[in-house]
Amino acid sequence: AKMVCLDLDHPEIIDFVNWKVEEEKKVAALIAAGYPSDYEGEAYRTVSGQNSNNSVRVPNNFFKTLDENGDWELKARSDGRTMKTVKAQALWDQINYAAWRCADPGTQYDTTINEWHTCPEGGPIRASNPCSEYMFLDNTACNLASVNLRRFFDEQNNLFDVKGFEYTCRLWTVVLEISVLMAQFPSKEVAQLSYDYRTLGLGYANLGSMLMVSGIAYDSDEARAIAGSITAIMTGVSYTTSAEMAAFLGSFDKYQLNKEHMLRVMRNHRAAAYDAMDAYEGLEIKPQGIDAKYCPDYLLKAATKAWDSAVQLGEKYGYRNAQTTVIAPTGTIGLVMDCDTTGVEPDFALVKFKKLSGGGYFKIINQSVPQALRNLKYSEAELEEIVNYAKGHATLKGAPHINEISLGEKGFLPA
């Protein structure tokens, strides 16, 4: 796989946006003619663009032009001349349609990405890896490691094991730091820059399953606060560990060159943990921090403590690593870790079909549903009836004992 990025003011941006839309039309015609529809079949092997993820790099000034219903200038790469002018709204509509039609292109918000860049003295961030979680300098890399959040969640008491999670984040930060020395890289340049910056890739998976088990709607203020606090704990603890390693081993080679930039980014992370909107530095768009109104107090305290430590130790010792965390889709390793959901994603279905080794399928309920119903205070008898209904109808709509009004108030929408 590869990531292909194009700046939004590139003269060929419209062709790029519509590239896969047109290729998918060819696939549809071939399938209609009788070719197999599987992604490794002849239809998909015949068309272009199937080995890449495409993204457009969108700067903040485009959205200002969009709000004003203005014209967007497409610039020559060689000398910056305006080659063509298009309506910003028309271009944005095409991007949205293409993403809906064939899932490409994605959007990468160039201004925001570079405002959170820890090492701008090394150059701008121009692209990402194929899954778009790792954003750093050209020709750098990081090794990934993800933690299964469900393993830290006490389903009976609806509590997250903060101490265990912090220990795991510390341990894996050290492991990933060691991996910088042990990893094999595809080129000398990638190897050298990876040694110079020592970027790491600690993340997590199974957030959607953990939220479902706890009885909290994925698209809710409570879920966003919990996810934000857990992410803040992970990243804060990881940078704290990086600073502790720097005290003994020294900071990464390019740290002094980027010291003030990196410390500013660290302070902005701390401001987000405290939801201190006035404390952000050098940001055109200020992010939503952790909302204390919706976040469990023990998670919020752990998040702010982690970032206080990360900033204080970083100011004293620097950091061993230019970046420490990313949240990957975990598509393959998530299966090995027994995750019901990947990365930060919600579960895709309440009812699933399990393929049998001897052939055939049987229908199973999402394994998070029974415990979610228990945490929502349904009795075992009610739980059994709801589960059996869902397996038979593939939906909870119309199920016995389900109060759709109260579920709607909690953020669960009809499905």
Annotated model-derived regions:
Residues 1-415:
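Long, C-terminal-biased catalytic regions of enzyme "large/alpha" subunits
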